[in-house]
Amino acid sequence: DALEPGSNVLMSFDYSPGTKPEIQPMAIAMLKQLFRGNHKVFLMALWPDGKFMSKDALKEVLKEYPDKVYGVDYVNLGYKPGGEIIINQLAKDNDLSVLFPADLTGLSINSIPIVRDLNSKDPDLSILQRFDFVISLSAGSVGTKEWILFGTDPAGVDFTSGCTSIQVTGLLPYADNNQQMEGIVAGLVGAAYYEKLMDYRGMARKSLPAQTYAHIAIVLFIVLGNLIYFIEKKDES
């Protein structure tokens, strides 16, 4: 919300269908917030399946924002292999077309208005430094940690992450005092809170009760198993 309207924001979709239930809801919520703020959104992926995750998220969000124009308000750069090497190049190089000669649809990158506007910024700035904010939607490596270590921290760019719940404890040190990361959205619970802040009932808020009941059932089965074990042990004695 603190970003000025028209800010350039880079979103990296670094996850696969296996973690889609956790991360896709937060991706959709973030895209909605960015479109609501009239920001310029650049999507990319460091995981092969990430390009499909970004397409699905966009398809969902554009139902609410049909006035957003491809190439003007947002662009999908697609998947780029190379992991942390790509992140490092984004932090050092100043020509986006070297890394992404074309977008996901095959359009020449330099023919896209939103990219030309980005390239018109101070030529002394790296590609990453031309962005006002960077977001990693991460299910592991390559993901949030690599973006911090090889990209946003060295480049001095504001950054946040949406990640799986299993990752969050390992990433919290980077968020201490907002030194290297502006907070974390973690797992389905984090996505549900995000949807609540955005004042809509999305996939996370709809799925959370089912997850809660499943966790309760697991705990009950564990307790029941222990009770049966102790009863049988007592009978044997």
Model-found features: residue ranges?
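Membrane-proximal low-complexity regions enriched in glycine and acidic/polar residues
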Residues: 73-170
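Juxtamembrane interface at the cytosolic side of transmembrane helices
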Residues: 222-237
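A mature extracytoplasmic/lumenal domain signature
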Residues: 13-17, 43-48, 81, 163
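Short, aromatic-rich amphipathic segments at membrane interfaces
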Residues: 173, 177-212
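Short extracytoplasmic
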Residues: 1-25
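Membrane-embedded segments
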Residues: 18-75
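Structural recognition of alpha->loop->beta junctions
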Residues: 51, 55-84, 178-194
